[in-house]
């Protein structure tokens, strides 16, 4: 294994650190910017602070050239992301989100890879009304983005209802414990009473500059790794024996993002360092976060994530630092096994209720011709007495359906032609894409709008090879930030330019291994021509129960990646 080249020494602070320091606990001049009717945008500094409030300024990239020719400013709009720990929401909240999507956004909702909602296409003048509408439904967007702990993920786990309920409660406790304490959110969006003297405020966990970069936490319940535990900055793996939650293994230092061409950036898988009882979870989470607060790189944001803090100083250093802050040591890690990181579709019977998992292609909730998905889910929400669970794979579980109500829900599913994905290929059922164009400002290539079209063509090859039902994890990301967690997929495409992608192979079916670059900067024709012989080879030579990601390593298409430090190929290894 190679060693990290990242320096432990901090240089001059990145400009974002100054913005946070002088923001008066995330207020900045956001309130004034919202009132400025001259432009549909806010200032650059406020845009960096707005993330902490759960929103990003964007523009419609499909319209950029046209508006530039007309000497108009970009078609500025905003994305709002909700904070929903564990992805659990009520039917009433679903209906509110549906209404806000039509009233203020682009008429659609996006289920994200971190189990929450995003609304796109909101203009500046409607931001506050949208936030207030969410708040009235007991939803918030605070800390859904920004250099802070983000939405805490939790295994949806309909098969083990009692365990899920207990683990879900811990995800909420961790989420609540790590919320910022500033009153800025309530002052700006909910028009609460302003604090006259900001010296009355403090952030005991974060401090006035919060974290160096985003921080992500998730809780998994084996054997399902649907939350991709190894991608999290901090992960808790539930240890369950005879239906009883004993505690959690603690995993640290995962993360997906990187920068094209910079080998000092890379995806990384987390490492399991020990075990704690449930009552210690929030304490462990807080101490881990404070270590990143104090030692994370605040000079170079490309190397500011927690994985680089650990890799530059060493896992042994981190464990010593954590033990010192805790005042006690984690117990030895307990045995666990994951079998997959996907979803189980269709009806599943729990202890007292039924749960229905629907396939939502790339998480987009909208009505299209012959598929009134948004309308169908709206009608279900009107009669559903349980809850909705947003899965980490961008799908939706209609959960806690009573036996008496099951037929009514099923009739609505059939009436609106909603799908469990059973007729789709195993590849499509395990597919995932980020939003990318036209709203994401970081996108280098299409993702959500293109992956379904590419899958249509790949499925032709699967049919030819007899692999249509083979479960294979495939993911696409429009840029190397990796919101769809592509580095853990058996097949992944990461955008480099419009129509061009890096192709990666060799992730594991259960999400425990990174993939490896196989071809660089290729378009659709080469993608299909590359996959065809590999699929044929797989169909012919796969061993019993062997998954595609394991096969391509055994067959020599790519080398196994055991750590993010070994992720980048040398030039002679790359096929171009």
Curated annotation (Swiss-Prot):
Residues where [4Fe-4S] cluster binds: 434, 440, 479, 483
Transmembrane segments: none
Alphabetical GO biological process terms: cysteine biosynthetic process; hydrogen sulfide biosynthetic process; sulfate assimilation
InterPro entries to which the protein is assigned, alphabetical: CysI, NiRdtase/SiRdtase_haem-b_fer, Nit/Sulf_reduc_fer-like_dom_sf, NO2/SO3_Rdtase_4Fe4S_dom, NO2/SO3_Rdtase_4Fe4S_prot, NO2/SO3_Rdtase_4Fe4S_sf, NO2/SO3_Rdtase_FeS/sirohaem_BS
Molecular function GO terms recorded: 4 iron, 4 sulfur cluster binding; heme binding; metal ion binding; NADP binding; sulfite reductase (ferredoxin) activity; sulfite reductase (NADPH) activity
Subunit structure of this chain's protein: Alpha(8)-beta(8). The alpha component is a flavoprotein, the beta component is a hemoprotein.
Full protein name: Sulfite reductase [NADPH] hemoprotein beta-component
Organism: Oceanobacillus iheyensis (strain DSM 14371 / CIP 107618 / JCM 11309 / KCTC 3954 / HTE831)
The gene coding this protein: cysI
């Amino acid at each position: 294994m190679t060693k990290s080249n990242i320096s432990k020494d901090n240089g001059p602070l990145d400009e974002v650190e100054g913005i946070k320091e002088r923001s008066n606990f995330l207020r900045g001049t956001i309130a004034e910017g919202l009132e400025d009717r001259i432009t549909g945008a806010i200032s650059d500094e406020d845009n960096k602070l707005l993330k902490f409030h759960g929103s990003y300024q964007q523009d419609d990239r499909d319209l950029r050239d046209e508006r530039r020719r007309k000497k108009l400013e970009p078609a500025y709009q905003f994305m709002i992301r909700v904070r929903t720990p564990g992805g659990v929401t009520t039917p009433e909240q679903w209906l509110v989100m549906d209404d806000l999507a039509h009233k203020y956004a682009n008429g659609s909702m996006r289920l994200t890879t971190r189990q929450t909602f995003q609304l796109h296409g909101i203009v500046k003048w409607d931001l506050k009304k949208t936030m207030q509408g969410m708040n009235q439904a007991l939803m918030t967007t605070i800390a859904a983005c920004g250099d802070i702990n983000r939405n805490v993920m939790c295994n949806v786990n309909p098969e083990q209802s009692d365990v899920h309920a207990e683990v879900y409660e811990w995800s909420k406790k961790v989420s609540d414990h790590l919320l910022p304490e500033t009153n800025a959110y309530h002052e700006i969006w909910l028009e609460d009473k302003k604090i006259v003297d900001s010296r009355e405020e403090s952030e005991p966990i974060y401090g006035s500059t919060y974290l160096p970069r985003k921080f992500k936490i998730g809780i998994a319940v084996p054997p399902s790794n649907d939350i991709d535990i190894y991608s999290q900055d901090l992960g808790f793996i539930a240890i369950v024996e005879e239906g009883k939650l004993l505690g959690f293994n603690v995993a640290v230092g995962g993360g997906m993002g990187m920068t094209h061409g910079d080998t000092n950036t890379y995806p990384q898988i987390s490492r399991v360092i020990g075990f704690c009882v449930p009552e210690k979870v929030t304490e462990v989470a807080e101490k881990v976060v404070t270590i990143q607060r104090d030692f994370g790189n605040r000079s170079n944001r490309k190397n500011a994530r927690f994985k680089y803090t650990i890799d530059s100083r060493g896992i042994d250093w981190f464990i010593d630092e954590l033990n010192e802050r805790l005042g006690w040591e984690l117990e030895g890690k307990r045995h666990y096994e994951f079998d997959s990181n996907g979803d189980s579709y269709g009806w599943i019977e729990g202890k007292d209720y039924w749960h229905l998992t629907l396939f939502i292609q790339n998480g987009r909730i909208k009505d299209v011709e012959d598929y009134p998905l948004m309308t169908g889910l709206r009608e279900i929400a009107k009669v559903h007495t349980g809850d909705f669970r947003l899965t980490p794979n961008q799908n939706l579980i209609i959960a806690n359906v009573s036996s008496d109500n099951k037929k009514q829900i099923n009739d609505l599913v059939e009436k609106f032609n909603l799908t469990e994905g059973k007729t789709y290929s195993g590849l499509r059922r395990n597919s995932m894409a980020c939003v990318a164009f036209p709203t994401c400002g970081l996108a280098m290539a299409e993702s959500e709008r293109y992956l379904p079209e590419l899958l249509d063509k790949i499925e032709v090859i699967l049919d030819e090879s007899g692999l249509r039902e083979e479960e294979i994890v495939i993911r696409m990301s429009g840029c190397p930030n990796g919101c769809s967690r592509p580095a853990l997929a058996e097949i992944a495409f990461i955008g480099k330019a419009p129509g061009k992608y890096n192709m990666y192979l060799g992730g594991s079916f259960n999400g425990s291994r990174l993939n490896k670059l196989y071809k660089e900067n290729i378009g659709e024709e080469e993608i299909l021509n590359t996959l065809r012989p590999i699929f044929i080879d797989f169909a012919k030579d796969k061993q019993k129960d062997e998954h595609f990601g394991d096969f391509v390593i055994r067959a020599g298409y790519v080398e196994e990646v055991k750590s993010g430090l070994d992720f980048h190929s040398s030039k002679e290894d790359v096929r171009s």
